[in-house]
Design a protein with these regions (language model features):
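Domain-level signature for proteins that mediate thiol-based redox and metal-cofactor handling
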Residues: 1-51, 56-230
């Protein structure tokens, strides 16, 4: 039973994203350990590429992981902590007490992290449009065709599923009738705006993916003997 429950906990962790990189903490190898006791206590230890990763990003990941694991059926308690970080004690204590970011860093933080999460989700949506549209551009689709496309017109793919999910999180149109190319406010991109919009989307995607590769490299350097051991 504990093996099945651990698998369920791991699947829950698959839904927890690094907000800046838009990748699951499991894929990024940020999960140091994940165990579940016979009485249903799930213990998860997260790690990050550097000792000084931003506290706000770090707090989001630990808090999201705690919420995701706590929601797994059969888990009676979730102990989720962050190791080897300059603010580990504050983050771990704040998440355990469900104090929120402001309550945890009362002398430094003035706002909760909802707006930060929204900013990075917006970037993920922009980058996702490039991932989905790029094969169409490479196949010869022009601005008029791209501006007219809906999500239902696009071949199914993991990138399309991810784009729909991120749009849903932001309250943006994400059904089959929704335009493929959207501005951040949900308005359709016109054919005249397509080249500049896709240029911005491509640069955003490249920036996110480059940062992701840097983080993976830093993690391997920091934990050369402990990568992929969770």
């Amino acid at each position: 039973m504990s093996d099945q429950l651990r698998d369920a906990v791991w699947r829950a962790l698959d839904t927890v994203l690094d907000p800046e990189l838009d990748e699951p903490v499991t894929d990024l190898d940020f999960v140091e350990t994940c165990t579940v006791s016979a009485d249903g206590v799930a213990t998860v230890v997260l790690r990050l590429p550097t000792f000084f990763c931003a506290p706000n990003f770090s707090f989001l990941m630990v808090a999201d992981a705690h919420d995701a694991v706590s929601a797994v059926e059969g888990v009676v308690r979730a102990d989720v902590t962050l190791a080897d970080h300059h603010a580990s004690a504050e983050i771990n204590g704040g998440v355990a007490a469900q104090a929120g970011f402001v309550g945890t860093f009362a002398d430094e933080a003035t706002d909760e992290l909802d707006e930060l999460r929204r900013i990075f989700l917006d970037k993920a949506v922009i980058a996702g449009q490039d991932r989905v549209a790029r094969p169409l551009v490479d196949a010869g689709a022009g601005p008029d065709e791209l501006a007219a496309l809906t999500l239902g017109d696009v071949p199914p793919s993991a990138d399309l599923d991810r784009l729909r999910a991120r749009r849903a999180q932001l309250g943006l149109p994400h059904d089959d009738d929704a335009p493929l190319l959207l501005h951040s406010d949900g308005s359709r991109v016109s054919s005249a705006q397509v080249p500049l919009h896709l240029r911005r989307a491509r640069l955003t995607r490249i920036g996110i993916e480059t940062n992701g590769e840097f983080c993976k490299s830093f993690l391997k350097t920091r934990y050369p003997d402990r990568v992929g051991t969770a």
